[in-house]
């Protein structure tokens, strides 16, 4: 019998790339003419980004700049969860953007069910915030990866630790 092959499914965001994207967005905001005299800012906190601006229109522009820089740095926009827009001091508006790290229990159940329903001969096991997929054939594992890439999930997935 062939030795089992396996890989892990994770959802991770490179914190350093996020920091770089935030710094680039701040630089662009400082140089853009439409932000002259504006008190708009982007702050990075642990696991989140805080966007502050004069009004909702400028906040939308700040969001667009940040998203463009994130995509340029290779960070998927599915890794961002936008909070609601709230009032801040002095006619300002604030929005919190959470960075999604790890696979939640609900998403792990969805992914496991999707794999089981596909009838591909592999086993899945949830290990904390990641999922281990193992099977006898490497082709089956590649079929699972293709299946998950096509699936419409609301999180960004990475496939790591491919062992055969």
UniProtKB/Swiss-Prot annotation:
Gene Ontology terms for molecular function: nucleotide binding
This protein's record includes keyword Nucleotide-binding: yes
TM region positions: none
GO cellular component term, pick one: cytosol
The keyword Nucleotide-binding belongs to this UniProt entry's keyword annotation: yes
Family of the protein in this entry: Belongs to the YajQ family.
The protein's name: Nucleotide-binding protein Helmi_22490
Organism: Heliobacterium modesticaldum (strain ATCC 51547 / Ice1)
């Amino acid at each position: 019998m062939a030795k089992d092959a396996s890989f892990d499914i994770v959802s991770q965001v490179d914190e350093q790339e996020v920091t770089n994207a935030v710094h680039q967005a701040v630089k662009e905001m400082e140089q853009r003419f439409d932000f002259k005299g504006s008190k708009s800012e982007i702050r990075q906190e642990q696991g989140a980004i805080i966007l502050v601006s004069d009004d909702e229109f400028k906040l939308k522009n700040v969001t667009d700049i940040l998203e463009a820089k994130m995509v340029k740095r290779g960070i998927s926009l599915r890794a961002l969860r936008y909070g609601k827009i709230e009032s801040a001091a002095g006619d300002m508006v604030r929005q919190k953007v959470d960075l999604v790290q790890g696979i939640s229990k609900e998403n792990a159940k969805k992914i496991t069910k999707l794999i089981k329903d596909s009838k591909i001969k592999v086993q899945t096991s949830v290990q904390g915030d990641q999922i281990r997929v193992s099977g006898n054939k490497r082709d089956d594992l590649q079929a699972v990866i293709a299946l998950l890439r096509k699936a419409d999930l609301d999180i960004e997935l990475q496939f790591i630790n491919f062992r055969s």
